[in-house]
Amino acid sequence: MKSVIGRKIGMTSVFTEDGTTYPVTVVEVLPNVVLQKKTVEKDGYEALQVGYEDKKESRANKCELGIAKKANTTPKYFVKELEGDEIYSNHEVGSTIDCSIFEAGDAIDVVAKSKGHGYTGVIKRYHAHIGPKGHGSGYHRQIGSLATNGRCNNRVHAGKKMGGQWRPQTTTIHNLVVVDVNPNNNCLLIRGSVPGPKYSVMKIRSAIKSLKKKIPVSKLVNYKTETVEQIEKIQEEALEAKAKEEALKAEEKESKAN
């Protein structure tokens, strides 16, 4: 099993050569630095503890500084554990894991925190029935009777479904597909949506259910895979061409005036 930590950037659409449109989520996967290696002898299980996104040393405590020093890296904002025999055997403390471990067509699972909804009523939170909508009814989107039958039931039982905070929850979406891998820009394109708001951190791992085979994905036709340097060069060439065009127009105006 392969796994890596990434950050959700947003959603867009890409097209393939046969005209198919894919709604995709762009996930930034910066290099995951291995901070610790959990062993069966010492910890009782095997896993890699990785860090994502650098943190200033002034914002880290002594424990974080010590772990980062052993791995010869800087402290990290997000520290998570990754499981899997493949990444465990191929990486040591101080090494990095990036998006190149995946390929286009790989089936993956995404583990992330869903969006919170704040304070919500019982209709939205638990899908309770809506009351009568006539003008004479006493309620519309409120909960009905709280009473129960039986002895000593003149109270509201613990766990009664009512309105309240609908907080974020850790959610797993199974069997998504990697549409494209771009190691130059440290990003993955994942078909469909993933849980959580923009810029939230998530774990991407190989699919654990029956869909483990690689899915054929057609070649993309409108997706730019240039590096940052190549993009800057293209922009400079465009600016130079525009400047030449403006200079020619100015010369034509001067010649007409003369």
Predicted regions and their residues:
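Extended basic (Lys/Arg/His-rich) segments that typically form rRNA-contacting surfaces
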Residues: 1-258
